[in-house]
């Protein structure tokens, strides 16, 4: 399994972001407070329905916005799957796999395998295992 792309809308510090991801190792780098961990959080959230930071959905949505959107394209066993997540300030999140709404997080587990590990080789490094 590998993540092919990630799109964010109104997600934390990103009004709009689209990242194409290559199979293998991908490196996120940049100055402090630029959104690297926000990208990792979005990947984890789309794959598990929960934030590894313990954040509430309304905290993830940009200030003065009512909703945020995450789209993640995943390839598994030669098939590409689209995971869409809509976060709304005063409603439950909506999640769909290939356009079909899901009711339980466990429905993602056969498609996405994702874990976050905070191995601090240096104070600012975070590892995301896919």
Regions found by a protein language model. Give the residues of each.
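Pre-Walker A-like glycine/lysine-rich segment at the N-terminus of P-loop NTPase domains
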Residues: 1-45
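Alpha-helical hydrophobic packing sites
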Residues: 12, 126-127
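Nucleotide-state sensing region of NTPase/ATPase domains
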Residues: 47-118
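Conserved small/polar residues in nucleotide/adenosyl-binding loops
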Residues: 119-126
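Cytosolic catalytic cores of cyclic-nucleotide second-messenger enzymes
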Residues: 130
